[in-house]
């Protein structure tokens, strides 16, 4: 789940060139090519099925007919990128199992979207999450949110395509640009032609490939070192099994509180308001199916985290028994997993290819989701509002053209990434930097009825400035920091971003480092608190500006865009207390939207099927007393 968070310094274009390379067998190439062919076939099947009868709603929203399980697996695959597949085992190998406590944040990180964001978005019948911003604020705020999202995804998708290809090239000699082009072209074709339905079903297939590849490594690796019991014993003997680190200091990179609570805000920025995920919720048959798909992600996320952590422990136990070569130990940390896989599986034709297919499945799922979501927001937020007269056929052609265009842009960004060198780490971090302010913008609109458009715009800008100040300052500071000594098994590693003295001294108690002070300490804020810090900045600044500019006076407020925090809290009180407060109803499900006409979707009003689906979930927003709305607005 660690999207945008590489646990080590990113690969440089020259890293690993002096390290001995392993080679692929014919069977490995067959397995890898089979992944690409099957992914392309799934996309072409959905493109050819019903060719000529496709609608924009089918292309961008899978005709809002997707079931719970495929949506859940697609939600998981969207941000289970190759960066996480390489980064999580590397984190566990170098620093121990403290990162495993990230699983504690998944419960709230998925429960909140299921019961707050999904009901609001689904009942407004949106296509783009940023339509909400226009309904709540105005068109300017919508455009600002859309442009911010496009910037976030365009920067990130090039890195997601380039980084695993570079790692594969450094370890196996597999041609760098051949793999980049193959992935980019295959992904662009099936996303542009097949639309969201093709993306979701290829995500399902690629998720299975990811789990198979990782399980193969765990099974063979644990058998090689004497079983999982032996793996755990070796890791425990060398201090890699971490207990609860209860230090409340937010400047410590990984503690229980940082992982369990700071991680919640990171999860909300991904599963609550990111267009790629919101689009999947909205493609579900009913609101209930969307909520269930969000619930279903929880066990899958836990299994995914456990698998990544187990690979790190197996790798540690393996290299205790079969030490790395000096050249391998000096490679970039994110290459450790690939070296381990090639060392472990080199005598088993096809299995190295299966793991590489697993790695590139992570890239394909992330990139295809990016293409589809970018095409959707560009079409719905930047083009259709200005050209509402587009015919269905022209809109379909333009949507596919946008997906193709973003595919070419992704290849261009991959080339730019190859020229970045150390700046590549900043590009990877941008995804996390931008997610927090966008989360804050949606929370400002949803939970604070007094927030107005000027407050939203100024708050978003303040959040982005704060995000880039801390994020880039952290990267620059870490580049100039000293390197810690090698761990006990003789391999070396680089000091990761904002790693503080508390973490290092836990692993290496004989080594001391001076504590950062002043701005340097400010920059050492754990990356898991970035979303919380930056979203809070947006909310605080947005509220201050809103209060100074007259709140929502003279502007209409659609109650369907507000999540009724106060009524929800009051509904927990005894009925007698509720009567004394003169509130008849407190639920979000009882807001009256009769004053606000139904929003057209893709240029037309919802059809009978949509109304039937809404009836299955219960009638939304009916019959509230005005008292509740006034009380909520008074917040």
Swiss-Prot record:
Gene name tied to this protein: SLC5A6
Impact reported for residue 583 to A: No effect on biotin transport
GO MF, one example: monocarboxylate:sodium symporter activity
Effect on the protein of changing residue 138 to A: Reduced protein levels. Decrease in biotin transport
Keywords (A to Z) from UniProt: Biotin, Cell membrane, Disease variant, Glycoprotein, Ion transport, Membrane, Neurodegeneration, Neuropathy, Sodium, Sodium transport, Symport, Transmembrane, Transmembrane helix, Transport
Disorder: Sodium-dependent multivitamin transporter deficiency: An autosomal recessive multisystemic metabolic disorder characterized by early infantile onset, progressive neurodegeneration, global developmental delay, and developmental regression with loss of early motor and cognitive milestones. Additional variable features include seizures, ataxia, spasticity, peripheral neuropathy, immune defects, and osteopenia. Treatment with biotin, pantothenic acid, and lipoate may result in clinical improvement.
Pfam family, one: SSF
Effect of residue 366 to A: No effect on biotin transport
Result after altering residue 443 to A: No effect on biotin transport
GO cellular component terms listed in the entry, alphabetical order: apical plasma membrane; basal plasma membrane; basolateral plasma membrane; brush border membrane; membrane; plasma membrane
Glycosylation sites: 138, 489, 498
Quaternary structure annotation from Swiss-Prot or TrEMBL: Interacts with PDZD11.
Protein name from the UniProt record: Sodium-dependent multivitamin transporter
Outcome reported for the amino acid change (mutating residue 187 to A): No effect on biotin transport
Annotated phenotype, changing residue 78 to A: Reduced membrane localization. Decrease in biotin transport
Subcellular location, record wording: Cell membrane; Apical cell membrane
Membrane topology: Multi-pass membrane protein
């Amino acid at each position: 789940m660690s999207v945008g968070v590489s646990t080590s310094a990113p690969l440089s274009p020259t890293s690993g060139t002096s390290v001995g390379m392993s080679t692929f067998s014919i069977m490995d190439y067959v397995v890898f090519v089979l992944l690409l062919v099957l992914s392309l076939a799934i996309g072409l099947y959905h493109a050819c099925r019903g060719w000529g009868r496709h609608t924009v709603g089918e292309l961008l929203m899978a005709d809002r007919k997707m079931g719970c399980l495929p949506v859940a697996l697609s939600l998981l695959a969207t941000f289970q990128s190759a960066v996480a597949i390489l980064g999580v085992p590397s984190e566990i190998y170098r620093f121990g199992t403290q990162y495993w406590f990230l699983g504690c944040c998944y419960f709230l990180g998925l429960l909140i979207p299921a019961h707050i964001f999904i009901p609001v978005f689904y009942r407004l019948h949106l296509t783009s999450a940023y339509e909400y911003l226009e309904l709540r604020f105005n068109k300017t705020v919508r455009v600002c949110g859309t442009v911010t999202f496009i910037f976030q995804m365009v920067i990130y998708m090039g890195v997601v395509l380039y980084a695993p290809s570079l790692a594969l090239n450094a370890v196996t000699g597999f041609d760098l640009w051949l793999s980049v082009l193959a992935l980019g072209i295959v992904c662009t074709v099936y996303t542009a032609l097949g639309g969201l339905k093709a993306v979701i079903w290829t995500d399902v297939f690629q998720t299975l490939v990811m789990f198979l590849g990782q399980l193969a490594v765990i099974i063979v690796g644990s058998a090689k070192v004497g079983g999982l019991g032996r793996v755990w014993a070796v890791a425990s003997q060398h201090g890699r099994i971490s207990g609860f680190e209860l230090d409340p200091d937010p400047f410590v990179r990984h503690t229980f509180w940082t992982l369990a609570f700071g991680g919640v805000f990171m999860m909300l920025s991904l599963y609550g308001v990111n267009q790629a995920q919101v689009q999947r919720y909205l493609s579900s048959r009913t609101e209930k199916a969307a909520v269930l798909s969000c619930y279903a992600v929880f066990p899958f996320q836990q299994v995914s985290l456990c698998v990544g952590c187990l690979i790190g422990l197996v790798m540690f136990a393996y290299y205790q028994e079969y030490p790395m070569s000096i050249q391998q130990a000096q490679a970039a940390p994110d290459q450790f997993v690939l070296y381990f896989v090639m060392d472990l599986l080199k005598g088993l034709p096809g299995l190295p290819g299966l793991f590489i297919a697993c790695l590139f499945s992570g890239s394909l799922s992330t990139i295809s989701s990016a293409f589809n979501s970018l095409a959707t927001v560009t079409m719905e937020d930047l083009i259709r509002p200005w050209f509402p007269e587009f015919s269905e056929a022209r809109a379909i052609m333009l949507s596919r053209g946008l997906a193709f265009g973003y595919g070419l842009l992704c290849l261009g960004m991959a080339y730019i990434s190859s020229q970045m060198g150390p700046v590549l780490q900043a590009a990877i971090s941008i995804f996390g930097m931008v997610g927090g302010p966008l989360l804050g913008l949606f929370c400002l609109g949803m939970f604070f009825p007094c927030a107005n458009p000027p407050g939203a715009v100024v708050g978003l800008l303040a959040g982005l400035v704060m995000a880039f100040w801390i994020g880039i300052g952290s990267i620059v500071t870490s580049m100039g920091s000293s390197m810690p000594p090698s761990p006990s098994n003789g391999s070396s590693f680089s000091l990761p971003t904002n790693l503080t003295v508390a973490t290092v001294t836990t692993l290496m108690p004989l080594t001391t480092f001076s504590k950062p002070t002043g701005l340097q300490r400010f920059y050492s804020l754990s990356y898991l608190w970035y979303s919380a810090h930056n979203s809070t900045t947006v909310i605080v600044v947005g509220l201050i500006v809103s209060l100074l500019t007259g709140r929502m006076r003279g502007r209409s407020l659609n109650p369907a865009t507000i999540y009724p925090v106060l009524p929800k809290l009051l509904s927990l009180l005894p009925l007698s207390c509720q009567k004394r407060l003169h509130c008849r109803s407190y639920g979000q499900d009882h807001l009256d939207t009769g004053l606000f006409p139904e929003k057209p979707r893709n240029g037309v009003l919802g059809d009978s099927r949509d109304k039937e689906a809404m009836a299955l979930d219960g009638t939304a927003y009916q019959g509230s007393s005005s008292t509740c709305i006034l009380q909520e607005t008074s917040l």
